[in-house]
């Protein structure tokens, strides 16, 4: 039996990050966490490209554009969708998650889901660097592991 796992090491890998502008005060913290994780694990600034999109709904199309450009070994998607008083939240969350999964499966590169889907602003703040950690950091660590794992599998 062979067990294959990704390690937290990457050399000469380029990462694309897609960040939503809507809820930017939270998403900027997610981005900061992601950049911190990448840099702590040896990724150089010139190996990172960041694309800002208007909102979470626009993340998949730019993730797809990046993924199919053959420039990146992983795409990190960051955004925040907070439940409001209408069903808009459910539609956005469902379509963004499906879109990101679709991009990953069709491009054959890791496209990491770092979109917070929360009931309220307090939950979003907690997940962007306070009591519940920083999901941007966690997703970037996952991206590094996935790049290494994909390389090992070939």
From Swiss-Prot:
This is 6,7-dimethyl-8-ribityllumazine synthase. It catalyses: (2S)-2-hydroxy-3-oxobutyl phosphate + 5-amino-6-(D-ribitylamino)uracil = 6,7-dimethyl-8-(1-D-ribityl)lumazine + phosphate + 2 H2O + H(+). 5-amino-6-(D-ribitylamino)uracil binds at residues 22, 56-58, 80-82, 113. The gene is ribH. Transmembrane segments: none annotated. It holds the Pfam family DMRL_synthase. Pathway: Cofactor biosynthesis; riboflavin biosynthesis; riboflavin from 2-hydroxy-3-oxobutyl phosphate and 5-amino-6-(D-ribitylamino)uracil: step 1/2. It comes from Lactococcus lactis subsp. lactis (strain IL1403) (Streptococcus lactis). (2S)-2-hydroxy-3-oxobutyl phosphate binds at residues 85-86, 127. The active site is at 88 (proton donor).
């Amino acid at each position: 039996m062979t067990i294959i796992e990704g390690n937290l090491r990457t050399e000469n890998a380029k990462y694309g990050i897609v960040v939503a502008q809507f809820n930017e005060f939270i998403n900027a913290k997610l981005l900061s966490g992601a950049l911190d994780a990448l840099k702590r694990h040896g990724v150089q600034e010139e190996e990172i490209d960041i694309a800002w999109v208007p909102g979470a709904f626009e993340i998949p199309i730019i993730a797809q554009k990046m993924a199919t450009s053959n420039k990146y070994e992983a795409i990190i998607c960051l955004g925040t969708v907070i439940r409001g008083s209408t069903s808009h939240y459910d539609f956005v969350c469902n379509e963004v998650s499906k879109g990101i999964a679709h991009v990953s499966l069709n491009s054959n590169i890791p496209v990491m889901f770092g979109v917070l889907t929360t009931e309220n602003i307090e939950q979003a703040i907690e997940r962007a660097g306070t009591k519940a950690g920083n999901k941007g950091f966690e997703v970037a660590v996952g991206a590094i592991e996935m790049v290494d794992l994909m390389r090992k599998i070939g």
